[in-house]
From Swiss-Prot:
One of its GO terms (molecular function) is ATP binding. Signal peptide: none annotated. It comes from Ureaplasma parvum serovar 3 (strain ATCC 700970). The lineage of its organism: Bacteria, Bacillati, Mycoplasmatota, Mycoplasmoidales, Mycoplasmoidaceae. It catalyses: (6S)-5,6,7,8-tetrahydrofolate + formate + ATP = (6R)-10-formyltetrahydrofolate + ADP + phosphate. GO terms for biological process: tetrahydrofolate interconversion. Pfam families: FTHFS. Keywords: ATP-binding, Ligase, Nucleotide-binding, One-carbon metabolism. Disulfide bonds: none annotated. It is an enzyme of class 6 (ligase). This is Formate--tetrahydrofolate ligase. Transmembrane segments: none annotated. Pathway: One-carbon metabolism; tetrahydrofolate interconversion. InterPro entries: Formate_THF_ligase, Formate_THF_ligase_CS, P-loop_NTPase.
Length: 521
């Protein structure tokens, strides 16, 4: 008897050669008949700066997959795996909501197919072997103060940010990152296939020896062990929506402290199987979309066909910071920040209004739509949360029209990977955040001199709640600079991570975490 996921594969006519079942509702896709399909359309979902509960990008993306399929278009989703950090922290589950969610909901939000655990184990094995070399005073002569990779864990645990311990009587300072912000997670999501991952992994610098020579994974003779751990994890996971439409869920870096996009492997699989692929990137366009375009799309040498900007009255009110009647006009300034950013890429775009039928008044929705019309911005309402694919005629029609319109403009990125680091910083701060440049701490100034000429992508870690680096500066702040505290290097994925004020790659739990009296919903 066919499993549920096999029934969907057959019903949708997905040209899959080989897959491995994980229970009744999950399949690891191992090979596809036509991997080089050229005519698929890529739609990426982003948002304004969200309120703390989130903006509904994943729900909107899932709802759009269902809407397109309902109206006769072969659409597939390509989304990130939820991390148990936010699932048990502030945000809660991360696989959609209402009538637009993924199945199996409980498994996806917890252990899923074990990808996160595999990445955690592989990452921590690297650190353990490095420290074992130091403990045994091996000929590699690794400097205990120059270990570049930290341990990781898929739990929010602020006590592990900074730790001190002995390695054979050598005092060492280190810490943990959350798995979603680990170096291996970034490489996992930016690798094009198993071979590409293995090649980049082998050359990854993870430490330096006492005469400042780099120590790579291949020097540690660890490449084969890491590949053995991650062999199955690197295959993309296929699941389904509540309305039985296909979605790949694979990889899960955060966008505020990592690059915030699902795996390239899953995206390539989706493009090979569907005519329309709906993907998303974390938080607002200032974080997720900027990295999606300047890191993921640059790496793939690919231009998306449509950008969908999700906005909501709840987030507009959050940025307006008022209950006055004209809050929509005040909070709309944040929407315009993101539209100005999106326009820089030469990609068609649309605004999706994420409607909450329980709280949003028709009067306020009409006010919002009037503002969008005044700025000549195409828009459509999304009722995905409340109705699933029902009431989806408008969003489907406008999405298909814009996705298929001729756009011969070349993709314009914010920076080139060969630009100097100082120039990359300047371009993002001014063109994405609207800042008056940036300021460096003493530590960051010293690091900038060392990293200035690295041909790496720039990944800025900052708050998601403001276009600036200060979570309290809501809406459309002016006359500010971005403050860079330090730089961290991810040699695996070729990322320079610029850490802004009070940002940690290991989050802490909020005062009343979702883990208390947890309900899977």
């Amino acid at each position: 008897m066919a499993k549920i996921i096999e029934e969907m594969i057959n019903k949708k006519g997905l040209l899959i050669d080989d897959y491995e079942l994980y229970g009744n509702e999950i399949a690891k896709i191992k090979s596809i008949k036509k991997l080089n399909k050229k005519d698929s359309k890529l739609i990426v979902i982003t948002s304004m700066n969200p309120n703390p509960a989130g903006e509904g990008k994943t729900t909107t993306a899932i709802g759009l997959v269902d809407a397109l399929n309902k109206h006769g278009y072969k659409a597939i989703g390509a989304l990130r795996e939820p991390s148990m950090g936010p699932v048990f922290g502030m945000k809660g589950t991360g696989s959609g909501g209402g009538l637009s969610f993924l199945k199996p909901f409980d498994k996806i939000n917890l252990h899923f197919s074990g990808d996160f655990h595999a990445i955690t184990a592989a990452n921590n094995l690297i650190v353990a072997v490095i420290e074992n070399e130091i403990h045994n005073r091996s000929s590699m002569q690794i400097d205990s103060q120059k270990i570049l990779i930290k341990r990781c864990l898929d739990v929010n645990d602020r006590s592990l940010r900074n730790i001190e311990y002995d390695i054979n009587h050598q005092q060492t300072k280190s810490g943990f990152n959350i798995t979603a912000a680990s170096d291996l997670m970034a490489l996992f999501c930016l690798a094009h296939d198993h071979k590409d991952f293995e090649d980049k992994l082998a050359q990854t610098i993870v430490a330096y020896n006492i005469v400042n020579q780099p120590i790579r994974i291949c020097d540690l003779e660890l490449t084969k062990a890491i590949m053995a751990i991650l062999e199955d994890a690197l295959y993309a996971n296929l699941v389904r929506t509540n309305e039985d439409n296909p979605v790949f869920v694979h990889g899960g870096p955060f966008a505020n402290i990592a690059h915030g996009c699902n795996s390239i492997i899953a995206t390539k699989n989706a493009l090979a199987l569907g005519d329309y692929v709906v993907t998303e990137c974390g938080f607002g366009s200032d974080l997720g979309l900027e990295k999606f375009m300047n890191i993921k799309m640059a790496s793939l040498n690919l231009k998306p066909d449509l950008i969908g900007l999700v906005i909501s009255l709840k987030s507009i009110a959050y940025h307006a910071q008022t209950n006055e009647k004209d809050y929509v006009k005040q909070g709309f300034a944040n929407v315009l920040c993101h539209i100005n950013h999106i326009k820089k890429y030469n990609v068609s775009f649309i605004v999706y209004i994420n409607v909450n039928t329980n709280t949003d008044s028709e009067e306020d929705l009409l006010t919002l739509e009037k503002l969008l019309d005044e700025h000549q911005i195409e828009h459509a309402r999304s009722y995905a949360y409340s109705y699933g694919s029902k009431k989806s005629e408008e969003i489907t029609k406008k999405t298909i029209t814009l996705t298929n319109q001729i756009n011969d403009h070349e993709l314009k990125l914010i920076y080139d990977i060969k630009d100097h680091l100082s120039y990359k910083l300047k371009k993002i701060c001014e063109n994405v955040y609207g800042a008056d440049g940036y300021e460096l701490s003493y530590e960051a100034k010293e690091q900038l001199n060392r990293y200035e000429h690295l041909d790496f992508y720039l990944c800025i870690a900052k708050t998601p709640y403001s276009i600036s680096d200060d979570a309290k500066l809501l809406n459309n702040p002016k006359n500010f600079k971005i403050h860079i505290e330090r730089f961290e290097i991810n040699y695996a994925a070729k990322l320079i991570i610029a850490i802004t004020t009070t940002i940690y790659r290991m989050p802490g739990l909020n005062k009343e975490p979702a883990a208390k009296n947890f309900v899977m919903k």
